[in-house]
């Protein structure tokens, strides 16, 4: 209707054609991502886990604010220079030899503490960890790094040990099978005691309140075991970058799993 009113006032054929081309091109530029977005949510499907029943609410919010969502999404993807959104969970496996080339041993520093000599992280994660560690230190908090990168083979040892100690079902709530661990990505860190009690420590409380400001996201939040596949882990954070943390908080109920699954499915989908 709006286009008809505009065109009715145009007398020059050349101007009419120019306006028509502009409208057509503008529409096509906008609709490619919109079509992709709608395809991901088509037929009652969701591009992330819906076990908690939150997907309809998240989907409704996104689809009612497509333009703003797509602007944020494209900003996050365009600034993902370090490939920080690789998915690793109980449904998505990493290859046995998967190891990013920039995984390097941790070096003693003044920003955080570690007591093992076999710890390593990807370079962007380690740099961000130093920044966060310094910020915590300024607040009188010392961050203790307890576990970082794990190879496929090392994770196999950890998982099999847990199965032997606690049984299959309990181990699957506590420990990732080889190829499904975020630790193999080289961007995940376990802090402190690696126990539930860590949440009540000064460091645990500081991380819960501030980690996202430095690009670190809690991977397994309380109440989302059905979504993540793992029980609450107050000590386990994954570096995804500050833009992605803000994106997760704004659009995905602050649940990392929802956002990572969405980005994975977005990247997999192509619209002809």
Q: What are the residue ranges of the model-derived segments?
A:
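Sec-dependent N-terminal signal peptides of Gram-positive bacterial secreted proteins and lipoproteins
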Residues: 10-30
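Extracytoplasmic cell-surface/polysaccharide-interacting catalytic and binding patches
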Residues: 29-148, 152-272
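N-terminal secretory signal peptides that target proteins for export/translocation
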Residues: 1-8
């Amino acid at each position: 209707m709006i286009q008809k009113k505009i065109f009715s006032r145009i007398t020059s054929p050349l101007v009419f054609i120019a306006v028509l081309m502009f409208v057509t091109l503008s529409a096509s530029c906008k609709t490619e991502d919109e079509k992709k977005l709608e395809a991901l949510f088509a037929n009652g499907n969701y591009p992330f886990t819906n076990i908690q029943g939150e997907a309809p609410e998240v989907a409704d919010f996104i689809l009612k604010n497509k333009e703003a969502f797509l602007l944020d999404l494209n900003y996050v993807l365009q600034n993902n220079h370090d490939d920080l959104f690789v998915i690793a969970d109980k449904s998505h496996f990493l290859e046995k030899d998967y190891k990013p080339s920039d995984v390097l041993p941790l070096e003693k520093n003044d920003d955080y503490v570690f007591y093992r000599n076999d710890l390593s992280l990807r370079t962007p994660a380690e740099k961000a960890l130093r920044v966060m560690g310094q910020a915590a230190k300024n607040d009188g908090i010392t961050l203790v790094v307890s576990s970082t990168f794990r190879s496929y083979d090392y994770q196999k040892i950890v998982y099999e040990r847990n199965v032997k100690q606690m049984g299959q079902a309990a181990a699957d709530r506590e420990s990732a099978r080889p190829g499904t661990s975020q630790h193999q990505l080289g961007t995940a860190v376990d802090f402190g005691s690696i126990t539930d009690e860590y949440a009540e420590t000064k460091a645990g409380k500081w991380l819960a309140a501030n980690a996202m400001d430095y690009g670190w996201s809690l991977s397994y939040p309380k109440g989302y075991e059905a979504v993540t596949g793992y029980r609450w882990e107050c000590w386990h954070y994954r570096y995804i970058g500050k833009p992605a943390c803000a994106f997760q908080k704004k659009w995905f109920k602050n649940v990392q799993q929802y956002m990572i699954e969405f980005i994975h499915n977005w990247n997999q989908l192509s619209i002809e």
